[in-house]
Each structure stands twice: as structure tokens, then as C-alpha cells.
Amino acid sequence: MSSSSSHHPEFASCTANDDEHHLDEFELELVVQDVQRQQNNGSANTDQHERENLLLLDDSSKSGALKRRLFFDNLLKNVQDDHIRFLHRQKERIDRVDVKLPAIEVRYNNLSVEAECRTANGDHLPSLWNSTKGAFSGLVKLLGLETERAKINVLEDVSGIIKPCRLTLLLGPPGCGKSTLLRALSGKLDKSLKVTGDISYNGYQLDEFVPEKTAAYISQYDLHIPEMTVRETLDFSSRCQGVGRRPKILKEVSARESAAGIIPDADIDIYMKAISVEASKRSLQTDYILKIMGLEICADTMVGDAMIRGLSGGQKKRLTTAEMIVGPARAYFMDEISNGLDSSTTFQIISCFQQLTNISEYTMVISLLQPTPEVFDLFDDLILMAEGKIIYHGPRNEALNFFEECGFICPERKEVADFLQEILSCKDQQQYWSGPNESYRYISPHELSSMFKENHRGRKLEEPIVSPKSELGKEALAFNKYSLQKLEMFKACGAREALLMKRSMFVYVFKTGQLAIIALVTMSVFLRTRMTTDFTHATYYMGALFFSILMIMLNGTPEISMQIRRLPSFYKQKSYYFYSSWAYAIPASVLKVPVSILDSLVWICITYYGIGYTASVSRFFCQFLMLCFVHQSVTSLYRFIASYFQTPTASFFYLFLALTFFLMFGGFTLPKPSMPGWLNWGFWISPMTYAEIGTVINEFQAPRWQKETIQNITIGNRILINHGLYYSWHFYWISIGALFGSIILFYIAFGLALDYITSIEEYHGSRPIKRLCQEQEKDSNIRKESDGHSNISRAKMTIPVMELPITFHNLNYYIDTPPEMLKQGYPTKRLQLLNNITGALRPGVLSALMGVSGAGKTTLLDVLAGRKTGGYIEGDIRIGGYPKVQETFVRILGYCEQADIHSPQLTVEESVTYSAWLRLPSHVDKKTRSEFVAEVLETVELDQIKDVLVGTPQKNGLSMEQRKRLTIAVELVSNPSVILMDEPTTGLDTRSAAIVIRAVKNICKTGRTVVCTIHQPSTKIFEAFDELILMKNGGKIIYNGPIGERSSKVIEYFEKISGVLKVKSNCNPAAWMMDVTSTSMEVQHNMDFAILYDESSQHRDIVELVEKLSIPIPNSEILSFSHRFPRNGWIQLKACLWKQNLTYWRSPEYNLRRIMLTVISALVYGVLFWKRAKILNDEQDLFNVFGAMYLGSTTIGSYNHQSIIPFSTTERIVMYREKFAGMYSSWSYSFAQAAIEIPYVFIQVVLYTLIIYPSIGYYWTTHKFIWFFYTTFCSSLSYIYVGLLLVSLTPNVQVATILASFFNTMQTLFSGFILPAPQIPKWWVWLYYLTPTSWTLDALLTSQYGNIEKEVRAFGETKSVSIFLNDYFGFHKDKLSLVAAVLIAFPFVLIILFSFSIEKFNFQKR
């Protein structure tokens, strides 16, 4: 993004063919060939300075990165001042040779956007019942409960022009349609929305070119790959977005300069050449964007997420913007890009955008929530929106005149942006009315919009809309979807995939290490010294081969969660045409081939000779090859499933359907001869079939199995015949071919899924008909203003509060220096984030914590709150004069985190009620608590949406600003003595921010200690605070003291410093303060504000205050409570169970799917094993029934514990927050989590038993039926509690999934199904007894057949069934009572371990 990326209409208009819009590769080479030749060959004719500059082009070395950084450090020493000179130097070079830059003019005429939303009678929230109704829509209609759909106008007949060279501000309250307008103008609207009206770029309709490549929409949501650094993210974006027509501009400029004998500016020439090189791995443009966005300090820091330490919220927001502006687009539509940024950083960034717009002729529309006056004045034009209508669109400096004509006047010292948004509110509008109060009536947005259209400004705006098309032509527009050639796209995506695999090395190493451990265990179980070549041991060899295939198949399951994790970023980049789906899919698949080879090699190297397979090198490699193809086949299938279904719950559901199918028709659990003939097709389409055929004929057709005979048939052939796997050797290669075909098929399916399956659409929620009618009548029935803040003040006064000051002295905080920084030459192994912080927070004094993004504000709050889980803390923190005791401090603390973490399946009111229930003292009765909750909801203006589901960020439920207010409400309702708020107004518009701060101010007056980090406060909000702590980069304080009336104390302090500019009249003092204390000002004036503060009287006053407050008040006692938690254990359990019940009831995706899997599995098993329970002639018949029992117990159990992993992980982050707040003990939470599973598991088991029991034909006696139900129920509970335990023991879903597959394989190995208990080596038999499945199969088989005395033929001998069970399996009916006790003991032991793990382990890195 620079002026050199612009295009030239004059020489573009000279071409008649569209082909000439693309730069010929030969012509490009003429421009940069001297640079690249000298870069590669080191020409002797180039001086040293020039050769160093040539390294800037595409040098990925450490020295190259340093040179690129130094290039801009010298060029842009002070970004705010030097950037405009830099752009002017580029502009002067282009203008000097009369190359005019094209521009984009965007017109929209009578644009309307309509969405459909569901309405429903009664409960409108997603639930098991509502989802079931939806699944049976025909029945629902008969019952008169059909779902209705209502049409919502998101945008309503809006028109206007976005002109180049003019920076446009988009203002309006949340929900007014700003994002929809920006998406519409950039061509990014969802296809499900109904759009009418016209949008054109330079006169061309959106369907005549590629708007996604011509313009860039920058979302308010930050979607990035957590494992990549900032620089890597931008380099990849720059590489994929390409260089546009920068080379063409450079070619024309260079040609004209050469003809005129002009020597170009050396720095500008190097810059323009460097950013014109196609497909550059390391771009100088990245360093430019890092510089102007203030991200160079964290350039080599990983982005991170909720579980990985990374960027701050403000840094991540800037990265979202930087990711798009690093490209060559000429029009930008930016949605709330300043959320989480301080006013100084916002001013610097918007200043750069203003300069780019005005000098380099860009087209920009920027939506902001809380622009300061200084930022507001940077804009040329203004669009004001409300309720989907445009209230004003025109020059910024004429907006006040228009509203004066409408009867509204902006008061003195009132910020214009605040005024413009508040006059749209029915609560705030009257205070700005210029006429007599009695003549005032509320003027709705609809009326204001009509008044604007009738005004001369509105009429003037509409006139050119219907004028002829622009003559600027096509030069500024993009007509190709992709910037890179196919090969370059594959290279870019391949390089990134390799990087991400390297960053995920822990997962791969952990997975392979686990495989090696299982291989060693398997080898020792089937040890060659215990295996001989008789028929019985041939069965064991068959089991070992089956287990090897199963293990290799399960080894790839983490691929699902890893793929799902990257899908949001993929869909974002795909929508911007960074790359094609195939460019992503092929590297993501092909680069995993070495993983398949390594895992298969590890397995076979340990097991082949250890187990005692045929000692032949060729057969060794044949088995190895087969396992490689199996691994690739199933992992390709897993990737396809993840890309198609996109959510963990849905993906694991279909994964287990697939695995169930493979196991059923694989030829081992039920041999082919025992299958119903009409189901043989299933045998031939299962990849496991071909894996079985290939491995068993490779082993059992070896010469050693052809010597001894049974009934004139060799042992090898007999075992193959019994399992229906007797095929000639060439079937090995047929199996290889079939598996290879499945790999190609799944590769293609993966690519097609990514290409054609759209990202999961936002869930807009259903709306009750009653509420919809109320909204439609809003214009005629306006709610009267309520004095919510006074209510909350009175309510809080009824609950006693302890007034406690906080002091902190010489507070330091260090973390281990990230490896990326060490590689870049950072000198020390510890990185200091807080540097000798000293201060005091007092009751009744509202303190603001401010500073540039990354200065350490959140870090300071985390240290004070005790939230840090890593790093090194030094210094003294005292509460009420006594050293802080964390266990008691959390009882009086309310901490509003920057990340809004809530349970997605609760409503707004339920979330607040839950917090009040567990955090208010026990003496507060239920009625008072309910009233208190209602008043808090009204205070933060959530009462109107109290029944709305919280939902998942960026997908459904509450908007960003509503989530922020919910975070505040959840903490305020706890009635804390100390409140720490991390950016409580981020994401709120000015009016909502004022409401929140007003409420906080009133709360503070009741004797609470309150501190808020805050960005971009308006003058009114800033002066609502009493004291200020101002920080700079490096975690240092540069001011700590009172703000003063009209900010007099702060202004007085900084104006005394030599070189600091005086504050202007009507200037926002907070913005002025941030501006004059910026790093660039320190460099310009050669000063350090932290040192100046340390030497000031202000600092000495604070030290004295800290010393005074660090001494306990006489006769006071250290803060303590008789109990650790506000509520007793029973109330905790009851509240947690209440919440879990709502969460589970409203999670139909999770619960309905597992019920569906149970029913489907039972039906399929019932058909496959139809009436086989009483067919008992030989050992194979018993093995068939045993296989049915094994499949039934393991399939449903394994799905339960795999599917609960992602489901439980979502709630785990919430649990960390609630547990830190002291809401409940680990035991209460874990017992509630375990208890809520019981009714759902009970339903599963009931359905399974009622279907499978009669289908297979088990014995119909009450005793046997109860035993079957009881065993299946205990087994299912054990499986699901194992899943919960794995979540509590692991840092993320991927590792938990790997351990789950480890558990599954060990369960199978020691269940008695693969190898019966008497044959398990004595050194491993203890694992048999620790395996729940072994007891399950013992109970199932013994309860059915333990008293059956019918004789059967078993391995050439005649025995009764009961004796065979005892001899072969080690099962005896006399042990059933012990088995029953062990079965019920397993769930209880697992619950206790789950509780203990939650108590001891915290994987959240802070």
C-alpha cells in the first residue's frame, strides 16, 4: 500500500485490449533486471551502498531483515512527521514525469439490504426440543408450532458517493448497519441477504470486475493463525495479494525519467523497485506497514490466542488492519479498526491514512466508535447512520450546520462525534434541543433521514449519482481473482504449511512418541517368544495385525481438530482471493505424507520383529507400505470431514460413523462369511478391508504358515478362509491400488469441500413474535428515559462493602524472552514488562490506567489481580495495609477482563444471575438478589436483550459491544470492594461508553476501589475519572496523580516540561496528553518521560502516599473470611448443575448427535448381527457375538469421550475465569459436570438396549436384561468421564485428542478382545484389570452365556459354552458380583481424578 502501487490512466487508455492491463514479464524484467542480476551475481560495477540496498528486495536472511528495518528506521524516524514527507517524495517523482494516478470513485444508489430472521412462539432459544421440532417440520406444522420468518431491513434506500482523495468517517450506534454498508460497498455481503439497488466503481457494476481484489474490507473481528508471528502474517499476506500494477507504474515512471535524463531519489527508487517484485517471500512493504502501524516492536511475536500468550488486544487489532493494507488495493473499507487502541496510536494511524488518501489518491471509509476531536478532524467527509438509514452524508465541517437547521446545537466543550451520535438516541436527544422544552418532541432517525434528503445537501448529493459514468476507466480495477500464478500460490501455501507444521511440532512429536510407546507395549504383549505357528496363535497374529491397522487409523484423528482450528483464517483469506482452495488443500495434504511414513516406520520397526512376523525383508517392506497407505487414506478422510462439517462436534460425529462402518465391514470383528449376503458391498468399500487383505495375505501366505495342515488345509489358508480373506497374492497390489485410489478421492473431496462449502454462516438468532411486534412499533411507542444509574447506586448502598486501598511498590514483572526475539539478537533471557511500578488505588477514587498499546496496562492489572500463570513477579502488593493474600483477595475483587469470556449457551440474564448466585454473600436473599440483577442489567442497558443467547464470538449471539457490557455486568453484580476493569469501553460507541463510566463512577462513590484501563476517552469520560496512571512502552509510569477539574492537574504537569506543546482550546486533554508523550516526541526532543516523572515531586508524593497506606489502620485486622467461598458446597453444586443443565439442553449439536449415533449404530449392528446371539456351533460364533459386544461398547463409548473433548474445552476457558473469581470449588464444578451427563447417557443406553437386545437375539430374562443395561450404562459413563479427565490434563484439544486415541488403543489392546486375558503376559495383566472395557466385556459375555451348558466345537475340541468362556477368556459367572462393583467404581474414581486435575492444573498462559 503506497502511492507507487497506483495505476496510470493515461497510458492505460492508450491500450485497446484487456490483455495489456497485465504487465508482460519481459517488460517487468527490463525494469528490475539490473537489480536482480546484481543481487544474484554481485556485479562489480555496483558500489557498496547500492549492493546493500539490493538486499532489501527478497533477502530472507537475518541480516536482510535487519537492513530492511534500518532502511525505514532512517527513512521514517518520526512516523507522524516523516511519513508525509515520504509520500510527497513518491508523489513528486511520479508528478515530475507527468504520470497521473488513477482513483476509485464508489457510488451506491437506492441500496437496500434485507435479511430473514426466524420467529417462534414461546421459547425461541436453540434446544433439544426446538431442534427436534425443526427436524420433523411436517409434524410441527400439524401441531401449529411452525416457525415463521420475518424480514428485517438492515439497510433501507441509502445513496451516496465515496470520493477518492477524501477520507470518509462512518459513524453510528451499534446495530445501525455500518458493517453491512461497508461489506456491501466492498462486495463482501453474504449471499443469503437480499440486495437491491446499484453499486459501481468508476461506473462499473460489481459483476463487471473483481471487487474483492479491487477493494479491501477490514473486519472488526481479528482472525489470524495464532502460531504465526506478526511479520510472517504480513509477509504471507503481501505475497498472496501481489504487487498489483506497481511494476507497470514503475516501468512507465522509469522510462520517462530515462528519456528526460532525470536521476530518481535513491531511497524512493529502491523502495518502489523492492515492492514491485512479484511473489517476494520477504517484502519491504511489510516493514513499511509495520512502521506506520506501530507493530515493529512485536514484529517477531506470535499472534497467540486465548490459550497461547501473544499480542495484546490493540496489537491484534492493528495486525488485522495491517494484513490488508500491505496489499496493493486502492479502496479500503475499515470496520471499527480502533477498538483497543489508545488515542495517540489511533491518531497516528488515521493520520497516515489521511496522508495516503489525500496524497496518494486512495479511497477510504473508516468506521469508528469513539473518535476523539483530533481524530475526527482528520476526516474530510462524514456518513452518519441510524437504523439502517443515512442521516447525513457530506463534508465533515458542515454536519453541525445541518443539525442546527434541524433544531439541535452542540454545546461548548462537547465533542462533535459524541454530539452526533447522542442526538440519535431518544434518551439523550432533548438536551441538545435549541428551542423551548415544551416544543420538543423526539425526532426519529427516519424523520432525520427524510429531512436530510429534502435538504440542499442531500439533494446535491443525489444529483451526481444519476450522472453519467466516471471516465477514469478500468485501470484502477482488478479483473483477475488471484494475484499469483498457480505455482507461486502452491509455493506460498506450502511454505506456510511447513512453518505451521514446525510450530505444531509438539503435537507431531507427542503423537509419534505416543505411537512408539503403544508399539512397545504391543510388541511386549505379542512377544515373539510366546507366539508359535499353530492355529490358536494364528488367531492372535490376526488380532495383532488388526490392532496395528486400527492403531494407524486412530493415530490421525488429531488432524481433525488441527484442520478445524485453521478454517476461520482460511475462509477469510479465501474470500479475499489470497489463494485458491486447491493451493491450500494440496500442501496441507502432501506435506503430511512424511508424517505418515514416519509414523508407519516407527510402528513397524518396533513391532514387526518383536511380535514375530515372518522374518523376510520383502514382507517387512510390504507391511510397511500397506500401513503408509492406510495412514494416508484415513488422515485424508479426516481432513475432508473437518473441512466439510467445520465444527468439532459435527466432525467427530461423522468420523465415528465412518470408523464404525470400517470396523463393521473390515473383516475382523465380523468375518465376511458371517455377514448377510446383501451387505457384502460394505465389505468392498471399506478401506480397512483392503488393509486387512493386504496385511494378512502378506503374513499368512508366507512359507512358515504353509507347513502344518488342518484337514488338508494349511494353517495360513485356514485362518484366511475363516475370516473370508483368502485371496491370491496379486490382491495385495489390488489393495494398494484401492487405498491409493481412496487417498486421491479424499484429496479431491477435501479440495472440493474447501472450494464449495461456505463457512458456517452467522446465526442471527430467532426472535419471539411478541418482541418483533414491539420493535415494529418502536417509532410510535418510545420508551421514556430512566435514571438507571441512581437505581444502581441505591441498590449497592443496601449491601455493605469493605473500603480497602491497594498499594504496590517497586513492582516488576518478567517473562522468558520469546525464542523469536532471541534469534533477532535480544540481549537478555528475560523480557521485562513492568519496571518499578509504584502507586496506590483508594476507595471512592476512580482511577484511569492509560498508555499506548503494549505499554503493560493489562499486565499490571493481571499482576495486581493475581491472574498471571507464568513469569516472575517482584515487589510488594498490599490490601488495606496488609500483604495481599490471593485466596481472600479474589473474594472482594471484580475483574473485567479484556477478553469477553462467557458461557455461550446461557442468556444474558442467566449469566448475570449465575454470577450473583455464587458471588454475593449467603445473607443476601433470593428476592434481593433478583432485584439487584435486574438493576445491574438496566444500568448497563442489557435489560432489553436479557433473553438473548450469549453465543459464540464472531458466529452468533451478542455483538462485540453487548459482550463487553455483559462482562461488566457479571462483575458488578458480585458487589466487589475492588474493581479492576481492562478496557471496559472498548467496542462501545461513545454513548454506551458514557453510560458504563457513569455507572462505574456511581459505584465508586459507594466506597469501592476502582481502576479502569481506557483507550480513546472523550473529554467527558476522561474527566469523569479522579486520578490517572499513565504508562509508556517498557512498562514504566510517566504520570501518576490527580486529573483535576477540566484536566487542570495533568495539563499543568506536562506543560511544565520543556518542549511539550501547549494544549489547544476545545482539545481533548486525553488525546493531547497521549500525543505529547508519544515515543516519537521523546525521540524528537531527546527526553524520557519516565525519568522526568521519577525525578518529579509528583512521584515523591505518590511514594509518600504508598508508604502511608501501606501501614494498617490501628485496630484493623487482615482481610479474612471464615469460608473460602461465598456460598457453601451444596449451593455451589446446585448452581453449577443449574448452569450445566441449561448448557446441555441448549446444545443440540452435541447431544442430539450422540443420540443419533447411538440409534444408528444400534440399528446397523442389529442388522449385521441379526439373531446371532443363539447361534452357537463353534468358537467363531462366540467370537461373532463377542465382536458385537465389543463394537457396541467401544463405538458409543469412544464417540462420547471424543466428542466431549471440544465441547468441554469451550467451557474450560470460562471455568478458569469463574474459578479465579472464587465462585466455586473444583469439586463442585466437576461433580456438576459429571452429574449432568447421567440423564443423557441414560437415554443413550435405553435406546441402544431396546434396539440391540432383541435384534441380536440375546436371552430374554429379567436378570440378563438388567445386567446388559447396567453394564452398558456404567461403561458409557466411564468413557465419557475419561474424556473429561483428558481435557483437564491437557493444554488443548489437539493433545487431548491424541491422548484419547491412546486411551482407545490401550482399551482395545487390553480389553480381552484382541488377546484374551489368560494369554496376556503377566507383566501387563495389571493393565487388563485397569481397563474398563475388559470388565465390560466380561460382564456382557458372562451374564449372557456364563450359565449356558450347550456344547460347541472350539479349536478342534468339544466344550460347553461356560467352560470355553472360563478356559479361553478367563470369564466365570461366580465373579459377576465383583465385576458389578468394579464397573460402578470406575466412574467414581474418574470423577475424583477429574476434580483433582481441575484443582491442580491450569493451562491458560497469562
Swiss-Prot record:
Keywords assigned by UniProt, alphabetized: ATP-binding, Membrane, Nucleotide-binding, Repeat, Transmembrane, Transmembrane helix, Transport
Binding-site residues, ATP 1: 172-179
Transmembrane segments: 506-526, 535-555, 593-613, 624-644, 650-670, 734-754, 1155-1175, 1185-1207, 1238-1258, 1265-1285, 1295-1315, 1323-1343, 1378-1398
One MF annotation (Gene Ontology) recorded for this entry: ATP binding
Pfam families, per the entry: ABC2_membrane, ABC2_membrane_7, ABC_tran, PDR_assoc
Subcellular location: Membrane
Gene3D superfamilies attached to this UniProt entry: P-loop containing nucleotide triphosphate hydrolases
Membrane topology: Multi-pass membrane protein
Binding positions for ATP 2 per the UniProt entry: 851-858
Cross-referenced InterPro entries: AAA+_ATPase (IPR003593), ABC2_TM (IPR013525), ABC_transporter-like_ATP-bd (IPR003439), ABCG_dom (IPR043926), ABCG_PDR_1 (IPR034001), ABCG_PDR_2 (IPR034003), P-loop_NTPase (IPR027417), PDR_assoc (IPR013581)
Domain of life of the native organism: Eukaryota
Family indicated by similarity: Belongs to the ABC transporter superfamily. ABCG family. PDR (TC 3.A.1.205) subfamily.
Entry function: May be a general defense protein.
The protein's name: ABC transporter G family member 50
Taxonomic lineage from the root: Eukaryota, Viridiplantae, Streptophyta, Embryophyta, Tracheophyta
